[in-house]
């Protein structure tokens, strides 16, 4: 009998796969509309900038006296003691939080909500930003870091500027140990070993005198867990797959 696959062990959810949430500083979200009214403007200040393990962007601790204190992804150039305005009447300057309908078109924004009150869902990683392309009625159109254009609610909040932490990928890891600790902070299993490099007892693609599955790797959608690896329920595979999809009108 073969050993359990990586995906089977992952699905069981033992501690080695669980997110190290107890090390996190805070969720990094905007306060709910019950705490900060969407139609009112507040003024706070940055108390602290802190690294959050497992997150690609530092967090800023914002305090609004006698109202709220919260952590959000910091903007590039944000500093301790900086005044931050939150609301529709806030100035559209770096670090301030405004609803999309109050932000000029063409502005760089990050930590963008999809719906008012969800706390921020888009462009949250270090160095990421979206661009407000246009506004129409109750909707706003933004261009995401991927280049995709998305329509969101115009009352959704966003932070002006670019998320801090840009350039983190420019420093090389240099050795495998650094990569190990990098992914350990995010509860990601590393390194990921290919199935064909394993022994036959460890994986359906393992074994043999050379690294090849030795048979077609397409498996059924309802295949049992120990067998369900490779091209799952694939319509086509190989060189002619792209042409076949084009003939069928598929993406």
From Swiss-Prot:
Annotated segments matching region Disordered: 1-22
Similarity-based family: Belongs to the universal ribosomal protein uL2 family.
The name this protein goes by in its record: Large ribosomal subunit protein uL2
Pfam families in the cross-refs: Ribosomal_L2, Ribosomal_L2_C
Job description of the protein: One of the primary rRNA binding proteins. Required for association of the 30S and 50S subunits to form the 70S ribosome, for tRNA binding and peptide bond formation. It has been suggested to have peptidyltransferase activity; this is somewhat controversial. Makes several contacts with the 16S rRNA in the 70S ribosome.
GO molecular function: rRNA binding; structural constituent of ribosome
Any one cellular-component term (Gene Ontology): cytosolic large ribosomal subunit
Top-level taxonomic group: Archaea
Bias-annotated ranges (Basic residues): 1-12
Signal sequence residues: none
Regions that span the bilayer: none
HAMAP family named in the record: Ribosomal_uL2_A
Gene Ontology biological process terms from the UniProt entry: cytoplasmic translation
Entry keywords, A to Z: Ribonucleoprotein, Ribosomal protein, RNA-binding, rRNA-binding
Self-association state and partner proteins as the record states: Part of the 50S ribosomal subunit. Forms a bridge to the 30S subunit in the 70S ribosome.
SUPFAM superfamilies, per database record: Nucleic acid-binding proteins, Translation proteins SH3-like domain
């Amino acid at each position: 009998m073969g050993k359990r696959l990586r995906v089977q062990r992952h699905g069981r959810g033992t501690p080695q796969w669980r997110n190290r949430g107890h090390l996190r500083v805070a969720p990094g979200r905007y306060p709910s509309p019950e705490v900060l009214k969407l139609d009112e403007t507040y003024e706070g200040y940055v108390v602290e900038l802190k690294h959050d393990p497992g997150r690609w962007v530092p967090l800023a601790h914002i305090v609004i006296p006698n109202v709220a204190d919260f952590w959000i992804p910091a903007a590039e150039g944000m500093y301790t003691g900086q005044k931050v305005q939150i609301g529709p009447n806030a100035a559209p300057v770096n670090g301030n939080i405004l609803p999309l309908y109050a932000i000029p078109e063409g502005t760089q924004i990050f930590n963008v909500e999809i719906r008012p009150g969800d706390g921020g869902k888009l462009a949250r990683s270090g160095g990421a930003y979206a661009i407000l392309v246009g506004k129409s009625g109750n909707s706003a159109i933004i261009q995401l870091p991927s280049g995709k254009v998305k329509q969101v609610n115009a009352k959704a909040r966003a932070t002006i500027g670019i998320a801090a932490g840009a350039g983190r990928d420019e420093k090389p890891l240099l050795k495998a140990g650094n990569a190990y600790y990098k992914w350990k902070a995010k509860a990601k299993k590393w390194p990921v070993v290919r199935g064909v490099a394993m022994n036959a007892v460890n994986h359906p693609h393992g074994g043999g005198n050379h690294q090849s599955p030795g048979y077609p790797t397409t498996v059924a959608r309802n295949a049992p867990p120990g067998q369900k690896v490779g091209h799952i329920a694939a319509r086509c595979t190989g060189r002619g797959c792209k042409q076949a999809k084009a003939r069928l009108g598929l993406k």
